[in-house]
Amino acid sequence: HERTHTGEKPFECSECHKRFTRDHHLKTHLRLHTGEKPYSCPHCPRHFVQVANLRRHLRVHTGERPYACARCPARF
Protein backbone atom coordinates (compact mmCIF):
# COMPACT_ATOMS: atom_id res chain seq x y z
CA HIS A 1 0.00 0.00 0.00
CA GLU A 2 2.87 2.40 0.73
CA ARG A 3 3.79 2.48 -2.96
CA THR A 4 0.52 4.29 -3.63
CA HIS A 5 1.86 7.22 -1.63
CA THR A 6 5.52 7.10 -2.67
CA GLY A 7 4.92 6.60 -6.39
CA GLU A 8 7.41 3.72 -6.43
CA LYS A 9 6.87 1.37 -9.37
CA PRO A 10 9.51 -1.36 -9.14
CA PHE A 11 8.02 -3.75 -11.73
CA GLU A 12 8.95 -2.83 -15.31
CA CYS A 13 7.75 -4.31 -18.59
CA SER A 14 10.73 -5.51 -20.63
CA GLU A 15 8.84 -4.82 -23.88
CA CYS A 16 7.58 -1.25 -23.50
CA HIS A 17 9.16 -0.16 -20.19
CA LYS A 18 5.85 0.72 -18.56
CA ARG A 19 6.16 0.42 -14.77
CA PHE A 20 3.79 -1.01 -12.15
CA THR A 21 3.39 -0.95 -8.38
CA ARG A 22 2.40 -4.62 -8.17
CA ASP A 23 3.88 -7.70 -9.83
CA HIS A 24 0.48 -9.11 -10.80
CA HIS A 25 -0.35 -5.89 -12.66
CA LEU A 26 2.81 -6.41 -14.71
CA LYS A 27 1.87 -10.05 -15.32
CA THR A 28 -1.54 -9.03 -16.66
CA HIS A 29 0.02 -6.26 -18.77
CA LEU A 30 2.49 -8.70 -20.36
CA ARG A 31 -0.45 -10.56 -21.89
CA LEU A 32 -0.97 -7.57 -24.18
CA HIS A 33 2.43 -8.26 -25.70
CA THR A 34 2.17 -12.07 -25.81
CA GLY A 35 -1.43 -12.20 -27.03
CA GLU A 36 -2.36 -14.62 -24.25
CA LYS A 37 -6.08 -14.50 -23.46
CA PRO A 38 -6.68 -17.07 -20.71
CA TYR A 39 -10.31 -16.19 -19.93
CA SER A 40 -12.81 -17.81 -22.30
CA CYS A 41 -16.50 -17.13 -22.70
CA PRO A 42 -18.47 -20.36 -22.23
CA HIS A 43 -21.18 -19.12 -24.63
CA CYS A 44 -19.19 -17.88 -27.63
CA PRO A 45 -15.65 -18.03 -29.05
CA ARG A 46 -14.43 -14.79 -27.40
CA HIS A 47 -11.37 -14.78 -25.11
CA PHE A 48 -10.11 -12.06 -22.77
CA VAL A 49 -6.87 -10.87 -21.19
CA GLN A 50 -8.54 -9.86 -17.92
CA VAL A 51 -11.26 -11.71 -16.01
CA ALA A 52 -13.08 -8.40 -15.40
CA ASN A 53 -13.53 -8.01 -19.15
CA LEU A 54 -14.98 -11.52 -19.38
CA ARG A 55 -17.44 -10.73 -16.58
CA ARG A 56 -18.57 -7.57 -18.36
CA HIS A 57 -18.91 -9.48 -21.64
CA LEU A 58 -21.06 -12.20 -20.04
CA ARG A 59 -23.83 -9.61 -19.62
CA VAL A 60 -24.32 -9.81 -23.39
CA HIS A 61 -25.48 -13.39 -22.94
CA THR A 62 -27.41 -13.01 -19.66
CA GLY A 63 -29.17 -9.77 -20.56
CA GLU A 64 -28.11 -8.27 -17.22
CA ARG A 65 -28.32 -4.47 -17.18
CA PRO A 66 -26.87 -3.41 -13.82
CA TYR A 67 -26.88 0.35 -14.39
CA ALA A 68 -30.05 2.46 -14.25
CA CYS A 69 -30.68 5.98 -15.47
CA ALA A 70 -31.56 8.32 -12.59
CA ARG A 71 -34.00 10.26 -14.79
CA CYS A 72 -35.93 7.51 -16.58
CA PRO A 73 -36.52 3.74 -16.38
CA ALA A 74 -33.79 2.94 -18.92
CA ARG A 75 -31.18 0.39 -17.85
CA PHE A 76 -27.77 -0.31 -19.31
Swiss-Prot record:
Cell location: Nucleus
One Gene Ontology biological process: regulation of gene expression
Database matches in InterPro entries: Zinc_finger, Znf_C2H2_sf, Znf_C2H2_type
Coiled-coil ranges from the UniProt annotation: none
GO cellular component: nucleus
Pfam families: zf-C2H2
Superkingdom of this protein's organism: Eukaryota
Keywords (A to Z) from UniProt: Developmental protein, DNA-binding, Gap protein, Metal-binding, Nucleus, Repeat, Zinc, Zinc-finger
GO MF annotations, alphabetized: DNA binding; zinc ion binding
UniProt zinc finger (C2H2-type) residues: 11-33, 39-61
Signal peptide, first to last residue: none
Function: Krueppel is a gap class segmentation protein.
Entry similarity comment: Belongs to the krueppel C2H2-type zinc-finger protein family.
Descriptive protein name: Protein krueppel
Organism: Manduca sexta (Tobacco hawkmoth)
